Amino acid sequence: MRTPSDRLDRRTVLQGLGAVGLGWAGAAQALDQPRGPVVLTLSGQLRKPNDGRNAHFDMAMLERLPQTSFSTRTPWYAQARKFTGPLLREVLAAAGAHGSLLRAVALNDYWVELPIDDAARHDVVVARLLDDKPMAVRDKGPLFMVYPFDAQPELRNPVYYSRSAWQLRTIEVR
């Protein structure tokens, strides 16, 4: 004869299934390990790092994220140019970034701080292509964080120009 302590009640079963389901969802969304050279590192407040407390991305990982393209004029080019890459918010989400401030650091150690809200409010792209071609370091590559200046005219000012970062190598999440 079974006693109440021998059988599982419905709530226990549902809680267990929920925990297993959450475990599967978390595993399915885990950030892959880079297989090629690391082109971007996220550090700081991350929920899904792939190397200790950092999230490293190679170019293939960035290519697998949803891609966005836009053409815009910038202070750095004489004509409008086409930028293609994942949205900054997609990159941050892939690493489980949470915080209020981002510090973008370039290969030459130039850095700029921007509110993390910019990633939600504006379609900021971590561009890996310029006019459909990979960017060399001498052409502001391999990654260029750029705002859609022409799509949102309020962005055409020194504050947002200064928040763009070419030769991007690191994003610190604070």
Give residue spans per PLM region.
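N-terminal intrinsically disordered, low-complexity segments enriched in P/E/S/T
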Residues: 2-6, 29-174
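N-terminal secretory signal peptides and thylakoid transit peptides that target proteins
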Residues: 2-21
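Residues within well-ordered alpha-helical secondary structure of globular protein domains
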Residues: 16-22, 68, 94
